[in-house]
Curated annotation (Swiss-Prot):
Top EC class for this record: transferase
Pathway(s) this gene product operates in, as recorded in its UniProt entry: Glycolipid biosynthesis; 4-amino-4-deoxy-alpha-L-arabinose undecaprenyl phosphate biosynthesis; 4-amino-4-deoxy-alpha-L-arabinose undecaprenyl phosphate from UDP-4-deoxy-4-formamido-beta-L-arabinose and undecaprenyl phosphate: step 1/2; Bacterial outer membrane biogenesis; lipopolysaccharide biosynthesis
Cytoplasmic compartment segments: 1-235, 291-322
Gene Ontology cellular component list: plasma membrane
Gene3D superfamilies in UniProt: Spore Coat Polysaccharide Biosynthesis Protein SpsA, Chain A (3.90.550.10)
Name of the protein this chain belongs to: Undecaprenyl-phosphate 4-deoxy-4-formamido-L-arabinose transferase
Reaction(s) catalysed (UniProt annotation): UDP-4-deoxy-4-formamido-beta-L-arabinose + di-trans,octa-cis-undecaprenyl phosphate = 4-deoxy-4-formamido-alpha-L-arabinopyranosyl di-trans,octa-cis-undecaprenyl phosphate + UDP
Subcellular location per the Swiss-Prot or TrEMBL entry: Cell inner membrane
The EC number(s) this enzyme carries: 2.4.2.53
Protein species of origin: Escherichia coli O157:H7
Family membership: Belongs to the glycosyltransferase 2 family.
Amino acid sequence: MFEIHPVKKVSVVIPVYNEQESLPELIRRTTTACESLGKEYEILLIDDGSSDNSAHILVEASQAENSHIVSILLNRNYGQHSAIMAGFSHVTGDLIITLDADLQNPPEEIPRLVAKADEGYDVVGTVRQNRQDSWFRKTASKMINRLIQRTTGKAMGDYGCMLRAYRRHIVDAMLHCHERSTFIPILANIFARRAIEIPVHHAEREYGESKYSFMRLINLMYDLVTCLTTTPLRMLSLLGSIIAIGGFSIAVLLVILRLTFGPQWAAEGVFMLFAVLFTFIGAQFIGMGLLGEYIGRIYTDVRARPRYFVQQVIRPSSKENE
């Protein structure tokens, strides 16, 4: 029987990248939600190398009177999950909640996650209801979720939703993992003894545009399999796929022509031989590309470069800056 420790302090970790329009509303609503908890709290906003005015807004928020905002400024853009890991390394709460800055997942859901964590769960995930994304984003998300479930064996419904709560020991365990590329929901579930998902509201994006373009989603899918971004090797795999599909299509066409018009249309089997050859060549390219992905991952991890570089940490005026 494990002792359930009540949540005493909540840390909200929010990565920010070019979100200057949504930041004032985000800070106001997140602060209001945290105040309603009746617990100690802090809000950590990580500027992931924004090129707009986001960093300046964060600094001003941290320096405001009675502020609970901790601003963490990275020197450049490292990506959503690396920015969150940077926030994890500075939290002081015993329950850590992650949240996107676009306000599509309302901060008002935070009390529900805290209440569920108080029931003894190590990880509280969320499933977006009535998603307000494009058809492409919804389809890509479903494909990624299925890929993760097949790869990890963890039957979670929505890995793409970053509105999640983690107990402190889960975050500490993740910080001890040193791989270069990290997908936090998967990593957390590796260490969680008890995990659960709850449905949450999903709103339309009011400010700016999604930071996940088509190519970023493709990269994310590859990273989930190999935990590395190596674009040239991926292009090799793509080339192999095209060749393999082309060879298979030719083979099907030749079979149809042979059955319909006789053996002379298939050049007495010569074209069929080429079709099979192209199929196998394509398969070899795919294998070489995937092998290259893993070799590239090993190379990157061996260099042991840090996931991110924190340029400055600005805490509320009552505390010293780092």
